[in-house]
């Protein structure tokens, strides 16, 4: 019986939230809400428009650093290894390569948005 009550409450709450989410955005629709904001491209315009090369380079740089940071995620589990010196040396080399890459990007003004 408790399972049936919990299921009924969950279904009723879900339907209520879905109904609110369906009707609420239509109440105050204005142009700023409909404009794209993430990358500056209008998704409804032509696909042949040129895009900013600076945005592309910053996006690729972010993607590379994000993937390299993902290599650091297993470090807490690597501490449990038998040879902790190897783990520390590997993590130090990885962080050093990241720092050198960041310094190089900074020196080449790859992180500056304005020229």
From Swiss-Prot:
It comes from the Eukaryota. Keywords: Electron transport, Membrane, Mitochondrion, Mitochondrion inner membrane, NAD, Respiratory chain, Translocase, Transmembrane, Transmembrane helix, Transport, Ubiquinone. Its EC number is 7.1.1.2. Pfam families: Oxidored_q4 (PF00507). Gene3D superfamilies: NADH:ubiquinone/plastoquinone oxidoreductase, chain 3. GO terms for cellular component: mitochondrial inner membrane; NADH dehydrogenase complex. The chain crosses the membrane at residues 4-24, 55-75, 87-107. It catalyses: a ubiquinone + NADH + 5 H(+)(in) = a ubiquinol + NAD(+) + 4 H(+)(out). Coiled coil: none annotated. It is found in: Mitochondrion inner membrane. Its main location: mitochondrion. InterPro entries: NADH_UbQ/plastoQ_OxRdtase_su3, NDAH_ubi_oxred_su3_sf. It is an enzyme of class 7 (translocase). GO terms for molecular function: NADH dehydrogenase (ubiquinone) activity. It is a multi-pass membrane protein. One of its GO terms (biological process) is mitochondrial electron transport, NADH to ubiquinone. Core subunit of respiratory chain NADH dehydrogenase (Complex I) which is composed of 45 different subunits. Interacts with TMEM186. Interacts with TMEM242. Belongs to the complex I subunit 3 family. Core subunit of the mitochondrial membrane respiratory chain NADH dehydrogenase (Complex I) which catalyzes electron transfer from NADH through the respiratory chain, using ubiquinone as an electron acceptor. Essential for the catalytic activity of complex I. This is NADH-ubiquinone oxidoreductase chain 3. It comes from Habromys lophurus (Crested-tailed deer mouse). The lineage of its organism: Eukaryota, Metazoa, Chordata, Craniata, Vertebrata. The gene is MT-ND3.
